[in-house]
């Protein structure tokens, strides 16, 4: 914790966490599949407090949190083929919570001076910052290998997570997070003209976020649409998606945010390194 004289303050935050992972999946018996993701969690966040005192001096207190850790996800899915045209699927996912590994420290800058910053309180974040378990469940309906409709639910008990000390954010606490999603994807034909082989996607979601400001919860809802463009050869799909997300506080509308995201991804379905067999 750091202190300064009476005056005005301004806050600014940047950064975030990223994950790089490898996924593995396989079928145990007919209709039953299991999978797992092994990920590397990394990133840096910056919480800046600008302090302007009554003596006309300005200081910057920058709290830096650097994370370097692993992350695991597990899943199981069962698929029931009712007949040649209709199928149902149900799945469960679980990601274990854990204390985060990394370091945190504060750097103090004197804005009115060119002097090097002072480093305050360099320490490990182990047992001070953590992420909770994540539970997920979903059901899906498939028609004629062309139409997919899916609903899913996600729960994260953020109220049990550790977040350490955040300067001037004592009124902000964490609460459990819920998310409900519904989406559909339609591919007119697996073969034929190119436009008929494009996959069209549409979905929406509602969530109660994990932040609680005083007695106000953060609500979020959004809509998304996208397309899957098959590449020549049919083994690779280029995915383009658009998201609109609205976030606001309730019962008091403290802050209202609107986001528009564009997503681009590639799915590789080629059986690399596998030699063809003569029959």
Language-model features: locations:
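Outer-membrane beta-barrel porins/channels
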Residues: 1-279
